[in-house]
Amino acid sequence: MNVVEQYNLTLKIEVLKEQSAETLARLCKLVDRSGTSDCIEVIKAYSHIVNTELYLATSINELEALKSDMAELESNIKESLAQISHGVSDEKCFKENSDVLDIEAYSSDDFDKALERTIDLLMFNKNISSAPHAVILGGQSGAGKTTIHRVKMVESKGDYIVIDGDTYRAQHPHFRALQEKYGVDSVEYTKMFAGKMVEAVIEKLSSLKYNLIIEGTLRSAAVPINTATLLKSKGYIVDFCLIATKPELSYLTTQLRYLEMLVVNPLQARATPKEHHDGIVKSLISNSNELEQSGLFESIQVYKRNLVQVYNSKQCTKPVGTIVENVLFGTWTQDETDLFNVGKAQELELRAKLP
């Protein structure tokens, strides 16, 4: 598979992951409201595809097959709930949420239920490790961190648990009502919930000694340093992996991801403000140096978008920031140029599909 095909596959995985994470959250809420345990195993099967099998897909055809499997599982869950006849439906749940006066708020019970549900699903078909390993990821929005998810998942045969705060937004008890009311700005009203969920999930799963991949941006060095300190205190080996991508290419990717979602379901589309993206880029060099100097990490690794590892602190003597700067702002390679040109063509095609 060439670099353009890898890029397209990763982009489709990212979009499908976001869509299916929202579907999973919605199905979980429906099952919870039904009061039945009949669908739990089917929910777990759906979750395993979302949280593991998507990352192991090696072709668009495999991805389409997984998409078909998820659609069948979703249909089975809805049919089972209809047969139970508890009067549970998407529309009823949404109406009840819409009637809540303060949809931005949530109770401790709401959070605890969402946390318990999330933990149970993430642990499904995963193994506790006697020598637990964690990989903390960094890179600006659109850099392609899913690339590293895929690399590490293949290396471990799917035995990492991915912790990604964006996929927890949909667990907010009033998520759909927030989307209806605020549109693309709804992310501002779910970020505190998602952030709290990430902290709680890390705390719980690290206490149980599961292997973890923890999504991040490296907007601040303090967050990965604090996370690594916590994990090392629990006996973890911790690596930091940065995906280094030309800013022009990563921002274009955020646009493509947004347009893909906009075409399928405008309510699910989530735009990335350019100032937010560029702010992360500006901090990557100094923050990566700070992480290396902290001495907390077993290794600092840097990957490019084409899956090539260009830096490993165990083998290189140069400061990591030097390598990061060169990849971000140095001469464009032919692969990078090809990816950008393909991306611009895809952007035009997607915009043509909009109403």
Listing of model-derived features with the role each one plays in the protein:
Residues 97-126:
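N-terminal pre-Walker A segment at the start of P-loop NTPase domains
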Residues 125-131, 205:
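Phosphate-binding P-loop
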Residues 140-141:
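The conserved Walker
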Residues 145:
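Conserved lysine of the Walker
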Residues 148:
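Hydrophobic positions on the alpha1 helix immediately C-terminal to the Walker A/P-loop
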Residues 161-162, 169-222, 228:
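Conserved nucleotide-sensing/catalytic segment adjacent to the nucleotide-binding pocket
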Residues 234-254:
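Conserved phosphate-donor/acceptor-positioning beta-strand/loop module used by diverse small-molecule
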Residues 252-355:
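Conserved GTP-binding G-domain of TRAFAC-class P-loop NTPases and closely related GTPase folds
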